[in-house]
Structure formats: structure tokens, C-alpha cells
Curated annotation (Swiss-Prot):
Cache domain boundaries: 50-290
PROSITE patterns: CHEMOTAXIS_TRANSDUC_2 (PS50111), HAMP (PS50885)
HAMP domain location: 383-437
Membrane topology: Multi-pass membrane protein
Disruption phenotype: The pctABC-tlpQ deletion mutant is devoid of histamine chemotaxis over the entire concentration range (50 nM to 50 mM). Deletion of the gene significantly reduces chemotaxis to AI-2.
Domain Methyl-accepting transducer: 442-678
Biological process annotations from GO: chemotaxis; signal transduction
InterPro entries linked: HAMP_dom (IPR003660), MCPsignal_dom (IPR004089)
Record keywords: Cell membrane, Chemotaxis, Membrane, Methylation, Transducer, Transmembrane, Transmembrane helix
Name of the molecule in the record: Methyl-accepting chemotaxis protein TlpQ
Subunit structure comment from the entry: Homotetramer.
Highest taxon in the source lineage: Bacteria
Length: 714
């Protein structure tokens, strides 16, 4: 519908423009799609590459942190290994030189102290020999801690260094050496001694807190077996402070993406020796910090395998390390948010998105410019094509606006489609001009005949309408009279029915009142009987009260007799003790009987009061029942009078209904006759109106046709 209103020029421009816009949109869309697809591929490849690089970097950081920790342990290991060889050398030299046992123990004590003082980073050094394994003379040095001997004379020296330069020594008693109670890691308390002794290899203990001086420090022990001819004769160990490991974890976290992650150091049992995020977890199990992955991490740690985990928004790396040769693996646990780890990849993605959006807008602008330029060229081309058609249209408009002048002709000089159109249009006018001339003469004759027919039809229609209005008034009056007669008959019949219903209701009311009277009489008789029974119950309650009074008196007398018996039994001494017990029981029974009598008395008094209330209520009900009987008798008399009046009304309604029915039948007959006459008159009036309308329409058409013909100039 919209295209029909457009000119040919605009139709050509619109359709060709839509095709051009479709092609431009397709090309731009395809280009944008390819660019976006390429951007996605580039982002995916670059993100994957940067992600892999970040993972490798994180693993490298884990290895670097593991090497730092391993170097820290290896420094202590090398120191302890050298000192253990020195102790064995001192023992060997003492035997070769036949050095006195006292001097040997004194020399060992001095050497341990000197070694500890020379290494302030070590918290303590200890040397423990098997019984009589040092010099075979333990029994000579019982309870001599100054020479490193314990309560059995066994050499078990421990030097502690709470602060650098402040050294204290003690000898470890046998109960400490034999203490196998479990520590936080699950290992025995004396694992520092039993582990190297039983394995024959150096051991690193799990982290534990111990009091050094006045401070609670997290520490671990590296213990070395003292072997002679393949047999372990003692243990030498050193305690190292693990606060340095906490410092290493914090330093590693600062170096790892500006401290946004976490570095943890784990022992073989899963205890934290360092935690950069929460120092409160030191010495505690991994299960408290990460219960979900603790089991898997500890299994990997025990197997010495590294692993990289993806967990929600974080990336975790477990890097195992061997603190000393032959020891169980420890581990470094690195945790970094993916947002920090993949920061370069995300920045590259944002840069690619910006470039893609910029390219999209450039392509859209170029496409839109090309489309506008193409539409302009199409519009100019369509204008050149439609200009001759507009010339022919202007000529036809001049002919149409020149009062239907059929004498004009279109000039045509060309031999194209437009010239052929003008030639055939001129030939059409040559045939139409004489026909229009003859039609104009015929129209003038038809108009005069139509004027005469319209005048006659108007007069006939007016007369029929006057007759129809008068008959319609008669029919309306007859119909109203019939309706009134029918209403009177219906009202009389309804009144008769209502009177019969009232009469029946009166009879039903009398029967109901009669039954009610009988029920009230029966109720009054029952109340009279019940009153006698309740009064008898009240008298029985009073008799029960007198019986209870007798029981109470007997109970009091029994109580007095039991009291006298108890007094006599007391006078009789041991001979009357049994009788005193019986008298006491009798007195208790008498007191309980007396209490029960008082309770029963209270119940009986309540029952008597209730009985008196019931008697009063029943007297009132009896009086109300007698009053109700008198009111019912009065209602019966009133209903009988109503019934007599309803009977008279019913007879009169029947006579009125009969007369109204006869009047209604006569009125209906008259109404039918008048309605038939009205219908015939209405039909004639309608036909007369239709005839007048046809004549008027014919007259209007003749006038219109003459007006149309007058527009043509033939």
C-alpha cells in the first residue's frame, strides 16, 4: 500500500537503495565477523601463551623458594655433620691416648658449648650416647649435669642458646629419652633420638613450638647418628629456629606478584613451618587451612611430586624439596589469584577489544558513506528515467483539468514507449467524443421523467404514513388493555395462592404449638421430679457430713491413745521399744485418716453448695416453663383467628380471579384483530416509502449523470 503512493522515481530509488544497503550491510557484517573471529583467535592464542608463561613462572618461583629453604637446611646440615664427626674424633682420640673419663666428658661439654657459641643462629646442640657407649663408666657420673651426665650417669648433654651469647646446659634424664608420647605431628616426643638411632640416617623433625628462655619459638631439629663400625652408639643434633623460614615465606610472597598471593612451607606431616598470610597457622596442620585439598596435597608431598591446581579464582603450586639428603620431602605451597597471575593476558584482551571496537566503527562509517553515495547516484539515474513520464502526466492533467475538453490531443514525436502511449490515447479520445455527445442528450430526457415520478411517490408515502400512525395508536391502546387484564388475573391468582399458603401455615403453626405445649408440660413434670431427687441428694450429703464427723472424732481418739501408748512404751525402756514403733505407726495412720476426713469434708461441702445451687436453678426453670405454657395458649388463640380471616380472603380472591380471566380473553381477541390491521398498514407504508426513495434516488442519479455529462466538452 505504501509503495503505491510513491512515484516511479522513488520506487526505483527505494528498491535499488535497499539492495545496495543489503549488499553493504552484508559486506560490513562479514568483515566485522571475520575481524571479531580473528580477534577471538588472537586473544585465545595469546591468553593461552601468557597463561602457560605465568604457570611456568609460578613453578619457577616455587623451585626458587624451595632452593632457598633447602640451602637454609643444608647449611645447618653441613654444620651438624661436621660437628658429629668431631665428636667421634674426640672419643677416638681419648681411647687412643687413654684419656681419663672425667676429662673426656669435660672436654665434650666444652666443645659443644664452644660450637654453639660460634653459631648464634642455632638454638641448641645436644649429644646423647647409648648407655656406657662413651667411656664405659656411666656409673661413676650419676647425677653430674655439669659433665653432661643424667640420673643414670649416661652422657646426655644439651646446650641451649636463648639469645646469642647466653648459653645454658642441662642433662636429659632417662624419662625424657624414653618419652614416646605423640606430638602435634603424630611422631613420638623422643623422635629426635629414636629416628637417627633406628634409621642410621640423619633426620629432620616436623616443626614444633618449644620454650627457649622466656620465648615460645617454632623450631625443628636435625639429628645425626654417631656410628662406630656400622653401629649407632649415640645421637648428635641441633635445634634451628624456623622464624627464618617464616621470613623467607614473607619475602617470597613480596617477590611474587607484589604480595597478593601466599607462600606456605610444609613439613612431611603437613605442619606449617612458614605461612606468609597467617602466622597463626605456624605449627598447625594443613587440614585447618585447606581441608578440601589437604589429603591430596600430603599424598603428593609424600611422593615428592609437584602439582599445579586450579581452584576457583586461585592457582596453587606444590613444589616438594628435600631439606637434607635422605630426609622425607618438605614442600613449598604457592597460591596466587588468577587475576594477578593472568594480569598481562587480561590487559592484552582489553587492548584487542578496544582495537576491534575501533575497527568496527571505522568499517561501519565507510559502509555508511558508500551506501549514501550509492543512493545519491541511484536517485539521479531514476530521475533521468522518469522525466519523460512526468511530461506525459502533465499533459494528461491539463486535459483533465480543462473541464473535460475531449477536443484536445497529446502531442507525440518520439517512437519510444511514451510516444506509443500518447498515440493510442489520442485514438481513444477520437472514439469517446461522439459517444459522450449522444449520452448527454439521453440524460436530459431521463431527468425530466424522474422528476415527475418522484413527486407522485412523495404524496403516496405521506398518506400511508398518516394512516399507519393512527392504527399504531389503536394497537398500542389495545395491547396495554390486554396486558392490564392479564396482570389483574395473575395478581388475583397469586393472592389466592398466598391466602391458601397462609391458611396452611396457620394450621402447621397450631400443630407445632400443640406439640411445643406437650413438650413444655413434660419438661415441667421432669423438673418437678428432679427437684425432689436433688433435695434428697442434699439431705444425703448432710448425712455424709455427720458420718465424717464421727470418723474424725474416732481418728482424734485413736491419735490420743497412740500418743499415750508411745509415752508408756518410752517409760518401759527397751522392753517397750517395739510397742512404741507400733504406737507411732498407729498415730501416723490416725493423723492421715484425720487429714483425709478433712479433705472429704471440703469435697462434701462443695457438693452440698452445688446441690443447693442446682435446686435454686431448677425452681427458676419450673417457673419459666409454667409461664411458657400460658404464652403458648395465647398464641394458639391468635393463630385460630388468623386462620378464619385467611379463609374469607381466599374466597374473595377466587371470585376476582375468575372475572379477570374473562376480561383478559376478550381483550386478547381485540388485540389480535388490531395487530393484523397494523401489520398490513405498516407493510403498505414501508412499500410507499421505498417507492418514494427509489424515485428520489432516480432523480438524484439523473441530476448527477447530467452534471457529469456537462463536464465534457464534445
Amino acid at each position: 500500500m505504501f509503495l503505491r503512493r510513491l512515484s516511479i522515481q522513488w520506487k526505483i530509488t527505494l528498491l535499488a537503495g535497499l539492495c545496495l544497503l543489503g549488499v553493504v550491510a552484508l559486506l560490513v557484517g562479514l568483515s566485522v565477523y571475520r575481524m571479531q573471529h580473528s580477534s577471538v583467535l588472537v586473544k585465545s592464542a595469546s591468553t593461552q601463551m601468557l597463561d602457560e608463561s605465568a604457570r611456568l613462572r609460578l613453578e619457577a618461583r616455587g623451585e626458587l623458594q624451595a632452593l632457598r629453604i633447602q640451602r637454609y637446611f643444608m647449611d645447618a646440615f653441613q654444620y651438624g655433620k661436621g660437628f658429629s664427626r668431631q665428636i667421634l674424633f674426640l672419643r677416638d682420640q681419648a681411647q687412643k691416648r687413654f684419656l681419663d673419663a672425667y676429662d673426656l666428658r669435660e672436654d665434650l661439654t666444652r666443645q659443644v658449648r664452644t660450637a654453639l657459641a660460634a653459631n648464634p643462629e642455632v638454638l641448641g646442640l645436644y649429644v646423647v650416647f647409648e648407655p656406657n657407649a662413651l667411656d664405659g663408666k656411666d656409673e661413676l657420673f650419676v647425677d653430674q649435669p655439669a659433665l653432661g651426665s643424667n640420673d643414670k650417669g649416661r652422657f646426655s648433654l644439651y646446650w641451649a642458646q636463648a639469645t646469642p651469647g647466653q648459653l645454658e646446659s642441662e642433662s636429659m634424664i632417662e624419662s625424657e629419652l624414653a618419652d614416646t608420647s605423640s606430638g602435634p605431628s603424630g611422631a613420638a616426643y623422643n623422635a629426635w633420638y629414636t629416628c637417627p638411632k633406628e634409621s642410621g640416617q640423619p633426620c629432620v623433625l616436623d616443626p614444633y613450638f618449644d620454650k627457649v628462655g622466656e620465648r615460645q619459638l617454632l623450631m625443628t631439629s636435625i639429628a645425626f647418628p654417631l656410628e662406630l663400625d656400622g653401629k649407632v652408639i649415640g645421637v648428635m643434633g641441633l635445634d634451628i629456629n624456623l622464624s627464618n623460614l617464616q621470613a623467607l615465606s614473607e619475602q617470597g610472597n613480596r617477590e611474587l606478584y607484589d604480595g597478593v598471593g601466599q607462600v606456605g612451607i610444609l613439613s612431611p606431616a603437613g605442619l606449617f613451618a612458614g605461612n606468609s598470610r597467617d602466622a597463626g597457622l605456624l605449627g598447625k596442620n594443613l587440614a585447618k587451612a585447606d581441608p578440601q585439598h589437604a589429603g591430596e596435597l600430603l599424598q603428593l608431598l609424600a611422593a615428592g611430586k609437584s602439582r599445579l591446581f586450579n581452584e576457583n579464582d586461585d592457582l596453587k603450586v606444590l613444589q616438594p624439596l628435600q631439606p637434607i639428603p635422605g630426609a622425607k620431602p618438605w614442600g613449598v605451597l604457592l597460591e596466587v589469584p588468577k587475576s594477578a597471575l593472568l594480569g598481562p593476558a587480561l590487559a592484552l584482551e582489553r587492548q584487542l577489544d578496544d582495537m576491534r571496537r575501533e575497527g568496527t566503527w571505522v568499517e561501519l562509517g565507510l559502509g555508511l558513506g558508500a551506501a549514501v553515495l550509492g543512493l545519491l547516484v541511484l536517485w539521479l539515474s531514476a530521475r533521468g528515467v522518469t522525466r519523460p513520464i512526468l511530461g506525459v502526466a502533465h499533459m494528461l492533467r491539463d486535459i483533465a483539468s480543462g473541464e473535460g475538453d475531449l477536443t484536445q490531443r497529446l502531442p507525440h514525436t518520439g517512437r519510444d514507449e511514451l510516444g506509443e502511449l500518447a498515440g493510442w490515447f489520442n485514438r481513444f479520445l477520437d472514439k469517446l467524443q461522439p459517444i459522450i455527445r449522444d449520452v448527454k442528450v439521453s440524460v436530459r430526457d431521463a431527468r425530466s421523467t424522474a422528476d415527475q415520478s418522484a413527486a407522485i411517490s412523495s404524496q403516496t408515502s405521506a398518506g400511508m404514513q398518516q394512516q399507519f400512525r393512527e392504527i399504531d395508536q389503536v394497537a398500542t391502546a389495545s395491547h396495554e388493555m390486554t396486558a392490564t387484564a392479564q396482570d389483574v388475573a395473575r395478581s388475583a391468582a397469586q393472592a389466592a395462592d398466598a391466602a391458601r399458603g397462609a391458611d396452611q401455615a396457620t394450621r402447621d403453626g397450631l400443630a407445632l404449638i400443640d406439640r411445643t405445649t406437650q413438650s413444655i408440660d413434660s419438661l415441667a413434670a421432669n423438673l418437678t421430679s428432679a427437684m425432689g431427687q436433688v433435695e434428697q441428694l442434699a439431705s444425703s450429703s448432710e448425712e455424709i457430713g455427720s458420718v465424717l464427723e464421727v470418723i474424725r472424732a474416732i481418728a482424734e481418739q485413736t491419735n490420743l491413745l497412740a500418743l499415750n501408748a508411745a509415752i508408756e512404751a518410752a517409760r518401759a525402756g527397751d522392753a517397750g521399744r517395739g510397742f512404741a514403733v507400733v504406737a507411732d505407726e498407729v498415730r501416723n495412720l490416725a493423723r492421715r485418716t484425720q487429714d483425709s476426713v478433712e479433705q472429704i469434708r471440703g469435697v462434701i461441702e462443695g457438693l452440698q453448695q452445688g446441690t443447693r445451687d442446682v435446686v435454686d436453678a431448677m425452681h427458676g426453670s419450673h417457673r419459666q416453663a409454667q409461664g411458657s405454657v400460658e404464652q403458648v395458649d395465647e398464641a394458639v388463640a391468635a393463630l385460630q383467628r388468623i386462620g378464619e380471616a385467611v379463609t374469607v380472603i381466599n374466597d374473595m380472591n377466587l371470585q376476582i380471579a375468575s372475572a379477570a380471566e374473562e376480561q383478559s380473553s376478550v381483550a386478547e381477541e381485540i388485540n389480535r384483530n388490531v395487530a393484523a390491521i397494523r401489520d398490513v398498514t405498516e407493510s403498505l407504508s414501508s412499500q410507499a416509502e421505498e417507492s418514494a426513495q427509489v424515485s428520489q434516488s432516480l432523480n438524484r442519479l439523473a441530476n448527477h449523470q447530467q452534471g457529469l455529462m456537462e463536464q465534457f466538452k464534445a
